């Protein structure tokens, strides 16, 4: 043997280790299925985005409702148009499985991927993970906030928002009766403060093209695939809290 092939290495970093320098350029935070965000974490992510030219890619189960949320499925599913969202110097992956595949398509396009998770388990759906941060998400973002005093730079978010708004404006008002038509018509009409339970694949993917009111939360049994138990989860949640609307 004259040559050893390169091996893809993943650096494991804990809260006690020296943090790597944050790459300069366009940074995307990719949020998979996620529990309700605390106000502290939301604020930390918002400030991080402002300091580092960041944007937050979401689907209906991400539950981040801060300032820089973009419904990235509409950007990721384009065959004849390459969105600015594809051009990322760093993608930071938080949360669990993402069932909106059109959004997942953006992940391999980043130059490098970092993951942050308090369970420390390596998850690498894009096969491009370079660093795994074993810590709470808020500790990760607060570290980089404390280390910087940058002026606001939101050019990447503004470009992604402009792309999304442009593509949304091109959607035909005569969508055939379908799951996508239902999502298009109903998503802005969901009552404030309610909770949506999406069946995986068809419903979740259809609804993730569109935005819902800011106080709406969304969930889906994204680990199921097949018979996902969506109705069971919906009924159980509605019985737990009878003061909230569930759909």
Show the residue positions of the predicted features:
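Active-site donor-nucleotide binding/catalytic segment of nucleotide-sugar enzymes
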Residues: 24-38, 171-175, 200
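Short boundary motifs at domain starts and secondary-structure transition points
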Residues: 16-22, 81-83, 186-188
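Terminal amphipathic helices with adjacent charged low-complexity linkers/tails
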Residues: 1-9, 115, 119-158
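Phosphate- and divalent-cation-binding pockets in alpha/beta enzyme and binding domains
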Residues: 40, 100-102, 143, 185, ...
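Conformationally flexible catalytic loops at phosphate/diphosphate-handling active centers
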Residues: 1-24
């Amino acid at each position: 043997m004259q040559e050893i092939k390169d091996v893809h290495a993943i650096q494991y970093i804990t809260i006690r280790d020296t943090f790597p320098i944050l790459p300069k350029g366009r940074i995307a935070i990719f949020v998979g299925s996620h529990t309700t965000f605390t106000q502290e974490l939301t604020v930390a992510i918002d400030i991080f985005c402002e300091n580092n030219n960041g944007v937050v890619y979401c689907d209906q189960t991400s539950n981040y409702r801060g300032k820089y949320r973009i419904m990235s499925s509409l950007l990721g599913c384009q065959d004849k148009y390459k969105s600015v969202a594809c051009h990322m110097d760093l993608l930071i992956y938080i949360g669990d499985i993402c069932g909106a595949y059109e959004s997942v398509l953006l992940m391999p396009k980043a130059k490098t991927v970092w993951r942050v998770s308090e369970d420390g388990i390596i998850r690498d759906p894009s096969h491009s993970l370079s660093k795994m941060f074993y810590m709470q998400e808020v500790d990760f973002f607060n570290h980089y906030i404390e280390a910087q005093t940058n002026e606001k730079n939101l050019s990447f978010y503004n470009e992604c928002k402009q792309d999304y708004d442009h593509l949304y404006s091109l959607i035909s008002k005569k969508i055939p009766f379908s799951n996508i038509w239902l999502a298009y018509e109903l998503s802005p009409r969901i009552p404030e403060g309610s909770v949506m339970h999406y069946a995986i694949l068809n419903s979740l993917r259809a609804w993730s093209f569109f935005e819902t009111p800011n106080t709406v939360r969304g969930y889906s049994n994204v680990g199921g695939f097949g018979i996902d138990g969506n109705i069971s989860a919906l009924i159980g949640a509605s019985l737990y809290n009878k003061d909230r609307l569930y759909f």
